Amino acid sequence: MNFELNEQQLSIQKMARDFTEKKVAPKVLDRDETREYDVNLYKDLCDMGFIGLPYAKEYVGQGLGYMEYALAVEEISKVDPSLGVSFSVATSLYGGSLYFSEATDEQLKRFMPPVLRDGHLGSFGLTEPTAGSDVSGMLTFAQRDGEEYIINGSKCFITNGPLSDYFCVYALTDHELGPKSIATFVVERNTPGFTIGARHNTMGIRSA
């Protein structure tokens, strides 16, 4: 078995390294100290095709694999863990929650391109004050109302949250089934009743 990187993988690795050294590294400490997120860096990642690396081209991905994606995340995270986490949340957690779910082709074509290509941030809404790694403590509930759902609950420690336009939100849909009824909903930032609360001053990864 050949464990060497192929030419395409080496090219992506070098592209990520060069971008990181030139554009990410110069102000990384300032961003961490001020807890500021540079959206332009994320847009650069979109322009280079990094955000959609592992997804099919029909959903504006690059049609490559997770090795290529991991190499890009690794190079960026070496210098700026916050940007690396932001990148991986948008790609793996937001994008993956849609791509590997029961989302329809119409939904994928509506909600993948804005985050993978157009520079809009995506977030993953799972963690709550009572539920994180243990999702059985989840309280957020989605009640069906005709053709729509009304979601009540709150999430915390949501990477990209303050600036995201799209959120994959996890919620219970049946009180009796509990965690077995958890479903994924895409919530757009301008949805009526949706608000973003105060930001926590975390120990690390402060500018994500």
Regions found by a protein language model. Name each.
Residues 9, 20, 72, 104, ...:
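Residue-level signal for inorganic ion chemistry
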Residues 47-121, 160-166, 178:
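Internal helix-loop-helix
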Residues 130-133, 157-160, 174-176, 201-207:
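Short Gly/Pro-enriched turn/cap motifs at secondary-structure boundaries
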Residues 133-134, 149:
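Hydrophobic, small-residue-rich alpha-helical packing segments that form membrane-like cores
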Residues 137, 190-208:
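Flexible, small-/acidic-enriched active-site or ligand-binding loops
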Residues 140-143:
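A structural signal for short hydrophobic beta-strand segments in well-ordered beta-sheet cores
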Residues 148, 152-197:
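A short core secondary-structure module
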